[in-house]
Amino acid sequence: MALWPSVFLLGLLPLLGRGADQIQTSSGKNTLEGQLWPESLKTFPFPCDPKTLAESVPSESVHSLRPSDIKFVAAIGNVETAPDSGADDLEEQDGTEKRPEQACMGVVTVLSDIIGRFSPSALMPLCPETRLVPRGGAEDLWMQATELVRSMRENPQLDFEHDWKLINVFFSNTSQCFPCPSAQQKGLVLGGMDKLTRTLDYLQQEVPKAFVNLVDLSELAAFSRWRQGAQLSPAAEPCRCLRETSQLTKVLTQWSYLEAWDSLLASSKYNTQESFAVVFQPFFYESSLSALLAEPPLQDPTTLALSLWNRMMEPIGRKEEPFSEKERKPLRCPTQESPYLFTYRNSGQLTRVSQPQGKLEVREGTEIRCPDKDPSDSVPTSVHRLKPADIKVIGAMGDSLTAGNGAGSQPGNILDVLTQYRGLSWSVGGDQNISTVTTLANILREFNPSLQGFSVGTGRETTSQAFFNQAVAGARADGLIPQAQRLVALMKNDTRINFQEDWKIITVFIGGNDLCDFCNDPVRYSPQNFTDNIGTALDILHAEIPRAFVNLVKVLEISKLRELYQETKVSCPRMILRSLCPCVLKFDDNSTEIASLIETIKEYQERTQQLIDSGRYDTRDDFTVVLQPFFEKVNMPKTQDGLPDNSFFAPDCFHFSSKAHAHAASALWNNMLEPVGQKTTHNDFEGAVNITCPNQVWPFLSTYKNSVQGFGTWLPCRDRSPSASPPTSVHALRPADIQVVAALGDSLTAGIGIGSKPNDLSDGTTQYRGLSYSSGGDGSLDNVTTLPNILRQFNSNLMGFAVGTGDASGTNAFFNQAVPGAKARDLMSQVQTLVQRMKDDHRVNFQEDWKVITVQIGASDLCDYCTDSNLYSAANFYDHLRDALDALHREVPRALVNLVDFMNPSVTRQVFLGNPDKCPVQQASALCNCVLSPRENSYELARLEALAQAYQSSLRELVESGRYDTREDFSVVLQPFFHSIQLPVLQDGRLDTSFFAPDCVHPNQKFHSQLSRALWRNMLEPLGGKTDALDLTAAITLTCPTQNEPFLRTFRNSDYTYPSRPAVENWGSDFLCTAWNASRGVPNSVHELQPGDIKVVAALGDSLTLAMGARPSNSSDPPMFWRGLSWSIGGDGALETHTTLPNILKKFNPSILGFSTGTLEGTMGLNVAVQGARAQDMPAQARDLVERMRNSPEIDLEKDWKLVTLFVGGNDLCHFCENPEGSSEGEYVQHIQQALDVLYEELPRTFVNVVEVMELAGLHQDQGGRCATLLAAQSHCTCFKYSQSSVEMQELKKVNWNLQSGLSRLSYSHQYVQREDFAVVVQPFFQNTLVPLNGRGDTDLTFFSDDCFHFSERGHAEMAIALWNNMLEPVGHKTTSNNFTYSRTKLKCPSPDSPYLYTLRNSRLLPDQAEADPTVLYWAVPVAAGAGLLIGILAMVAGRGMRCRPREDPPLSLSTGL
């Protein structure tokens, strides 16, 4: 790495810390005896025992000099910090002039203190004062030396001739641009030595008995904030190489620099005497750039002194351990074997390998004797059918192992490791041939001699010899991204290859350098970042390079390098090893750091596995990435003596030699031929190089898709031809005519869990769309059975299938728009997205291409139905599914829609609850609460099963309605294979979970394969003869179209008639609510009123409340009032046969009073409605009602809770048509308010429903036929004689809307919120009145009475349902349109969390009265509620595609679609 300035702001030499400030250059006592251990060392342990090492007689030779022999310590050379940039005033500048002396003294005092433990009589240390103006470099150093000698001579305590002295000479070589990469470090050292010679000569000549430490501070001086006065020459400008030098270059240069100094000094005149020696003490630093940027350097002189002392305790040749700014090493002690300070003479033979030894290692070749070396008969289009001889181009990305650093270096020639022997690189080198050099490229050249892209010779990645070997020495995972970009550009621009057509193999190997630095920056080198960087680089290759097979080699188990580092019997430059890979080598075996390293290696390997297993790079048929795991487990090769065999390594013992490159190449090749899941993960370097031949039966390079054969299926069909010309009818559609596939649905169709490994619950969110039974297109039918893969056997140009993994928005999804967790209500959104995608995709001819769309929904609805039984009711399920299919029918031409049943919840329960030891029972509520949580034989379970049956009935009813068979080019076919599933049972009687994902809820690939076969079989079976059961263990063969029946089956080509729907016997409803009880005590507040608390019902209104004409009558008879069937007050029969509001309330309180029965006035109960009544009649009806209640002996007026429904306005609108000038919207509201005032003043404990007037014109428009005549002839309502487009009708619509608007404001009137036991709530279900339609799209007259104006019994039932559901909806969120479609299950249930009838207050639109200002109430609440009302209207309009009438300018007509 480059020697950036910030890197070397280390903590060992900032000597102006607290210790330096306390040092005195003189004292009253000039010896260290009795002095306290210095402040900076008080807490530092002193482990040495001076008594065991002491000698009574001082040594006569410097080569046997013990610490106890030393009497005096001194130093020359400036060791100081630069003045602060902020020290501008003279006072501050004067302070800095003393810093050199203080800094020097800070170091030598600590050294003296250490020596004082061995030699109590040692004198106080000395740094000569410098009062002269510095002249720089060698001159200053010499002047300090002369001053030092003078001071020592004049010191009366020092016996200058006989006492041993320790002199430290601090210098730096910064002017020499140290340490720029150079193989000629000797020249640099000689230059430095020349500058030091005068000083060293002087000391040797003048100072007897001296041990001189030559302390090199070059790295620090060059780039820190320190100002070194003892630089050997004036500072020069920093050289450019400092920014370009790699970590490897820096380390090797440090080593060679150290070796050069030692070699020079060992043979110099300074080490020939007995009384004088000079020893080079190096300081090379292990540093983390990120750490130094984050923290300021330590300001402690002790650090340098301790490190220098420890260096003195190391033999020459072993002073290799770099200094770490993060940790302070313990103080080292002299040993019994070596109790002296080390010199070049007493260190013995230098252990550092300094010169090349031996001859160039013999390179290992091999031979290939494969019988089949031929390419494919034609150039393959699929990467999964790629033979070795089909490869025409080779490339590689990575670090120095791929660059080939040191691969061809002679043993001992450490500096030559800087040479990148790319031609020998295991994955891409092409030197010579396979007989002499074993590399992947040379192996492939045996199959295709014309291979291009391999590297030859030596050089960096920028040289022409590198070709497509773009590995960069020192690269980490984040360096792969620029490498990928460079490789793509080179390939695109190289005229020797055909970029689009040539098949390429690219090998990616990275991670060693990331692991080596992991401990210094765990965030940068985290497993997540490592994988993300690899993913980004692979994304570039995937996006840019066609026809490519990418090898991603798992990261090397680099921790095994510790064996080589720790074995001292093996000659290796440990300084280099440790510097290159500190995080692997510098910690103890049982340390937490090593445990973390091993775990990180494992995570690197696992995350890369997950990245590739995701299918992210298997989205194209001409590209794949295959993980090659042969480096996952590596044993250190050993010699016959059992020692680590360094012949497999370059001279630095870190990089591979050509021998290791050969073994790696053969291991990679063999991995490439081994099936995924069966690849060798252990590489034995000690064995012979072995080259495997491709299997003659299966000669392809193994990929994820061609390695999995277990889920494939054989298609026996011989006739796979399309129609002679594209069919125009869906009933004449052959499989080969299908050009587009698509799918809608939930997690099953999205592919959740299909490809998950057993027991891997963490993979529960991956959407394996490429394996989805109805829309997946991964692999081929040979190994992945899906409907698209079957159809591709008939039409290889099929479009729309999903591949790989990802969500619905990704390109991999294509036309699989299923969304995990989707409910029926989400289908419409999926349809809209699908239609838009089809229209926008240029590959699809939207109008002409035939499409198969598979729809499956319902399971997720059942999973959540118990949370909101209203939202997930069968009626809503039917409506949502119908709306989605209607949209497909309306928008998509030439389509066959498969409507597939959902998996019965009983199946899920059996599997999940029957295997508690395998299934995550604790997660049942999260996975599918309403299906998995109910107990056996419980009411909740029975309700679930009933709802599931209702859902299934909805599927059949929709298809059999024939509404989707009105066009020749569109049909919906129910495929019932999922209706009944036979689960496999193991021999011990337990259910076989091998067909399910780890969550035991979703089917896995084994299950999906069976679903695909069953779906295909259903599509070829005629209606009326379709298989409606699935045996998961059955051998389902793929059937074929026959000559007589070559088409996909529809109702018409099956000669099938849908069964007629049974006649509806009554208009009752099924009651599915569970909480039927009233409140525990009679509530005092209307805002806590539950349905079971209601004791009395009553109604005000006109002939609609009287149920006039609800049942047919003789045309000659006057119309009858069927009060007992009235929607808001009728009580005939029971809810199961007659749906009315009182019959609903009877389910909660069978003793309810006030409802009407029959047709006579005597049984009218509290129904005070009057035929022809208008708003002006409401106050009188209110008074009549109050009087009847007072006079009823059954009613406790004060205590009984009452429910009053007021509905009027139709006659007011009719009156407007007769006399526009005589009608006023204000009067209408005023009359209603007067009636409410009466109720408010007279009735305690009352809940009032005010139902908004219906849209009169919209409800009766386009009735046609006899109704057109009857309505026009209405004498009491002349509105219908006008056309819908007339001015009169437009005015009527305005008035209609104004009446609704005025009425909605009543419930916010301040006077009706003052009492705790009274509430007025406007129920707006008629606000947007929708015309009910029949199956043909015409107005359904069965909702109307014989006069076409009033409602029939069916219409009354629908009004009752709408009113009840409105009452259970919060104010501001109420349904504002009627849904007049038949279903017995549309009634909502009170929510367990909020079981009350909704009022303004419990809808949280009204603050407590005690806290609210009435004036604020009156204005603020209507605004808030109005906004909520508007939102509700807009949501309804958007969801149903309806056009609602704006308040300002009503449209000419209403949409009549449901």
Curated annotation (Swiss-Prot):
Q: Which domain of life is it from?
A: Eukaryota
Is Zinc one of the keywords UniProt gives this record? no
Principal subcellular localization? membrane
Q: Has keyword Cytoplasm? A: no
Q: Which residues are glycosylated?
A: N173, N433, N493, N529, N590, N690, N783, N1077, N1114, N1379
Q: Name one GO cellular component term.
A: apical plasma membrane
Ranges for the region named 4 X 308-326 AA approximate repeats are 39-1403
Fetch the CDD domains from UniProt. Phospholipase_B_like
Localization (cell): Apical cell membrane
Instruction: Look up the signal peptide feature and give its range.
Output: 1-19
Catalytic reaction list: a 1,2-diacyl-sn-glycero-3-phosphocholine + H2O = a 1-acyl-sn-glycero-3-phosphocholine + a fatty acid + H(+); a 1-O-alkyl-2-acyl-sn-glycero-3-phosphocholine + H2O = a 1-O-alkyl-sn-glycero-3-phosphocholine + a fatty acid + H(+); a 1-acyl-sn-glycero-3-phosphocholine + H2O = sn-glycerol 3-phosphocholine + a fatty acid + H(+); a triacylglycerol + H2O = a diacylglycerol + a fatty acid + H(+)
Catalytic residues of the enzyme: S400, D514, H655
**Gene Ontology biological-process entries:** diacylglycerol catabolic process; monoacylglycerol catabolic process; phosphatidylcholine catabolic process
sequence repeat positions: 39-347, 362-707, 708-1054, 1064-1403
What is its biological role?
Calcium-independent membrane-associated phospholipase that catalyzes complete diacylation of phospholipids by hydrolyzing both sn-1 and sn-2 fatty acyl chains attached to the glycerol backbone (phospholipase B activity). Has dual phospholipase and lysophospholipase activities toward diacylphospholipids. Preferentially cleaves sn-2 ester bonds over sn-1 bonds. Acts as a lipase toward glycerolipid substrates. Hydrolyzes fatty acyl chains of diacylglycerols with preference for the sn-2 position and of triacylglycerols with not positional selectivity.
Name under which the protein is recorded: Phospholipase B1, membrane-associated
Q: Which organism is it from?
A: Oryctolagus cuniculus
Taxonomic path: Eukaryota, Metazoa, Chordata, Craniata, Vertebrata
